[in-house]
């Protein structure tokens, strides 16, 4: 199992797209949206957990404390049921950063991909994005995520990847491919990168 997460607006969708190109399975086509999210897992599991503890289901404000996470029996079975059967299953959701201990316990063998982006670029992207409206201080919001990243590094089988680095140099994805047991497809990465869109807007950084 592969989990992809990071701050929203970091490029998690782009990195997940690359994982799909490398052969990862995201679920039945009718359950996966244009952001490479398995909507069934997101709506029925991730958002349900957040709402159970009165946290924002969009992962904006308020954020949950890791100490408040509820027990969620059957989490592994539920996730796998919504994903279906496929080689190299993967699930991407920026909100996994807020719930990672639950998914670590349910999937102790999982490989994690932590997507990174410059803090100021994330803040600017949040301020330009119509649905990012609940938080008044995006800088503090990014800091809250980065505090969680520190614990994730210590407790998860995790690799970090900076989206801008992959945009500039496809070989920067090699650490992700190796970590996830995939053969690096440089040509596939090059064909997936639209440099004009990345620098002009947040098309690839939508979550």
Describe each model-derived feature in a short phrase.
Residues 40-42, 63-64, 124-130, 147-155, ...:
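Low-complexity, flexible helical/coil segments
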Residues 44-48, 71-78, 137, 175, ...:
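Exposed alpha-helical structural elements
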Residues 1-74, 195-201:
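PAPS-dependent sulfotransferase catalytic core
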Residues 80-185:
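PAPS-dependent sulfotransferase catalytic domain
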